[in-house]
Amino acid sequence: MTDTAENQTPNDRQAGHPRSIRSFVLRQSHMTAAQQRAIDTLWDSFGIDYQATPADLDARFGSSRPKILEIGFGMGMASAEIARRLPETDFLAIDVHGPGVGNLLKLINENHLENIRVMRHDAVEVVKNMLQDGSLDGIHIFFPDPWHKKRHHKRRLIQAPFIAKLLPKLKTGGYIHLATDWEEYAQQMLEVLSSFDSLQNTAADYAPTPDYRPETKFEARGKRLGHGVWDLVFKRIG
């Protein structure tokens, strides 16, 4: 779900950083009139513009409920459903894919969801500059681009340097939940998360899919192709 498009906010295109890890892929895509209308009319209520200074998430949401960061949400269907299932939890959903941003805003409005805020920016920069240490109760990264060719593995999001940046943002007792339909990437994810002494696997290796996570289009696609799906849930213990 982090296999996304143009890195721009609704008001301003952001510069790329090709030599660093990014949470997205630059691709052209078509935005429907309904998606654009959702951005135009709902962004002020549910969108958060990027800033290079720490943000007060409780103030942005208007609540002190637990906060979950979601990196990459595709077209937003799973994000909206998770928020519907967990109304007492706030979700900060980040993606750069314009149609997906518009579609998630549309779903937020249609389902009367008050516990999601949306950002359209590189999640790596958001994590680095906007999120305060200890501000998150959980992190969801579902079906990031597997970059299946070996020469492209260095572009994968789930690498030790990025996890090291995420960990300080997570409260002790908070969790990281990853999911992929690419077995070799699942093995890499397991190795990366297991390498951190401050993270504890909640399962022997791969976890049962938690009840809150619905089947995504990426998961359905993988099953059609005969792929398995692997969930990993690690808890911060220190």
From Swiss-Prot:
Residues 1-20 are annotated as: Disordered. It comes from the Bacteria. NCBIfam families: tRNA (guanosine(46)-N7)-methyltransferase TrmB. PROSITE patterns: SAM_MT_TRMB. Its EC number is 2.1.1.33. Pfam families: Methyltransf_4. Keywords: Methyltransferase, S-adenosyl-L-methionine, Transferase, tRNA processing. Residues 1-12 have a biased composition (Polar residues). The active site is at residue 145. InterPro entries: SAM-dependent_MTases_sf, tRNA_(Gua-N-7)_MeTrfase_Trmb, tRNA_methyltr_TrmB_bact. One of its GO terms (molecular function) is tRNA (guanine(46)-N7)-methyltransferase activity. S-adenosyl-L-methionine binds at residues 70, 95, 122, 145. Pathway: tRNA modification; N(7)-methylguanine-tRNA biosynthesis. It catalyses: guanosine(46) in tRNA + S-adenosyl-L-methionine = N(7)-methylguanosine(46) in tRNA + S-adenosyl-L-homocysteine. This is tRNA (guanine-N(7)-)-methyltransferase. It is an enzyme of class 2 (transferase). Catalyzes the formation of N(7)-methylguanine at position 46 (m7G46) in tRNA. Substrate binds at residues 149, 181, 216-219. The keyword tRNA processing applies. GO terms for cellular component: tRNA methyltransferase complex. Belongs to the class I-like SAM-binding methyltransferase superfamily. TrmB family.
